[in-house]
């Protein structure tokens, strides 16, 4: 019986390891998206990825694909400025976008960072008030304000483009992450 249990456990571990694939398969898709969208937007961006050799369950990697694509598109469209805007702000004309994936204990941590303009909390709050999800006289923390972007239909964009402005996206990102029993946090410096 003991050897059967060990054999069964060995088979289970083998099957599980066959489901694990390196994140590089997803990252190569993301590189193409970054290249195409930055070209379309007239933005020059250096895209750094860390953690390509981290192995994840294929199903989890598939479920992370859409949220990561959306977050990176948002960074390009809303965060990273055009080369001209960056020069005026005293920055390098080439923007910087980083995606890092690593394991921390049992958790998988994914960080998306860009050196763009950051989130405009005043603009988000104004839009939230206009959208009817915030009160004009109430004081909100920055975290509370940033969480408005996860409300379905919410957008700070003044117009619709192929990339953004439809109010569809960050709520889906949050839902996808929640389905994986994950959390999402936004910081703006």
What does each model-found stretch correspond to?
Residues 186:
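Contiguous mid-protein beta-loop-alpha structural module that forms a pocket-lining wall or clamp
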Residues 113-165:
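Glycine-rich/acidic phosphate-handling loop/turn and adjacent ATP-lid/helix
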Residues 1-125:
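Charged, alpha-helical coiled-coil and linker scaffolds that mediate dimerization/oligomerization
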Residues 44-46, 134, 183:
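Residue-level detector of anion-binding/catalytic polar loops
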Residues 156-157, 167-181, 189:
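Conserved glycine-/histidine-rich ATP-lid loop and adjacent helix of the Bergerat-fold HATPase_c
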């Amino acid at each position: 019986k003991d050897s059967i249990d060990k054999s069964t456990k060995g088979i289970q571990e083998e099957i599980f390891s066959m489901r694990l694939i390196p994140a590089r398969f997803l990252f190569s898709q993301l590189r193409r998206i970054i290249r195409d969208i930055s070209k379309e937007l007239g933005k020059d961006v250096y895209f750094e990825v860390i953690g390509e050799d981290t192995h994840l369950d294929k199903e989890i990697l598939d479920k992370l694909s859409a949220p990561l694509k959306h977050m990176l598109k948002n960074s390009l469209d809303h965060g990273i400025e055009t080369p001209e805007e960056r020069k005026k702000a005293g920055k390098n004309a080439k923007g910087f976008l980083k995606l890092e994936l690593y394991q921390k204990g049992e958790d998988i941590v994914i960080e998306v960072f860009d050196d763009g303009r950051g989130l405009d909390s005043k603009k988000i709050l104004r839009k939230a008030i206009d959208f009817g999800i915030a009160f004009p006289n109430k004081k909100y923390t920055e975290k509370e304000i940033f969480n408005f972007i996860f409300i379905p239909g919410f957008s700070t964009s003044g117009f619709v483009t192929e990339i953004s402005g439809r109010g569809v996206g960050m709520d889906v990102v949050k839902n996808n992450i929640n389905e994986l029993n994950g959390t999402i946090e936004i910081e703006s410096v």
